[in-house]
Amino acid sequence: MKKITFVLTSCGRIELLNKTLESFFKFNDYALEKMYLVEDSFNQNVYSEIKKRWGKKLTLLFNEKKKGQIKSIVETYKLVNTPLIFHCEDDWEYTRKNFIQDCLKIMDSDEKIIQVWLESKESASRLDIFEYGPLQKVGNVGFRKVICKEGWEWGYFSFRPGIKRLSDYKLIGGYDNFKNELDIGVEYKKRGYYTVIIENPAVIDIGDDHHVSDVTRKWPKRRKAGAPTGLKRLWKHLKSFKF
């Protein structure tokens, strides 16, 4: 059995965090080496509630000042001693078993798969920039390649729930020099990596109406290669969309 560390980032959304962890513990049937929860709200009341509810289940990391999501991830990944990480956010509800095993089967089929999205195609396609390749299978596990529509340059990396290889993380020098997932994705794309989405979804996005602003994430103004500037109509959606 491959050794995996669980890392979850959270920022003050206790109700969503509880739903996420309750569903994860209900459906996960894969033995994990270590479980970390890093909380970035810098709110002592939140810290106390999380400690009371989850202190016996996970190793809790409470930031002493707000660091933002990416910095929190970088600091937590320094503690990881396993080749694989199951990365998770605080606003996803798990709906079935074997999702970690299914991720592993898919990622083992091609070292250039950077991650496996566990949500449905309908959920991922709320912003109409994705297309999906033909159905592929590893054993009984189906998946499709995620493709950005012509001109769009991202779609290759996300902090959505799923397996990440520590070797892939180290390949680009970690995330410390990046301000957003878009630029991380562009870097992986240059190296020939791509993303896939599972055919049998295992999570539901429950965070749409509870977006948390993160001033440390600097979103580039570019969105579509060669397109004129001023995509203001999409800007609001892009900032709240999950990558």
Predicted regions and their residues:
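Short beta-strand-to-loop element that shapes/binds the nucleotide-sugar donor at the catalytic cleft/hinge
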Residues: 116-131
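Conserved donor-nucleotide/metal-binding helix-loop-beta segment in metal-dependent transferases, i.e.
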Residues: 97-118
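Glycine-rich, basic loop-to-helix element that forms the pyrophosphate-binding segment
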Residues: 64-79
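N-proximal low-complexity "stem/linker" segments adjacent to membrane-targeting elements
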Residues: 1-22
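C-terminal catalytic/acceptor-binding lobe
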Residues: 19, 154-243
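Short beta-strand-to-loop acidic/aromatic patch adjacent to the donor-nucleotide binding site
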Residues: 83-93
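Short, acidic, metal-binding catalytic loop of nucleotide-sugar glycosyltransferases
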Residues: 22-32
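A conserved acidic beta->alpha catalytic loop
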Residues: 37-47
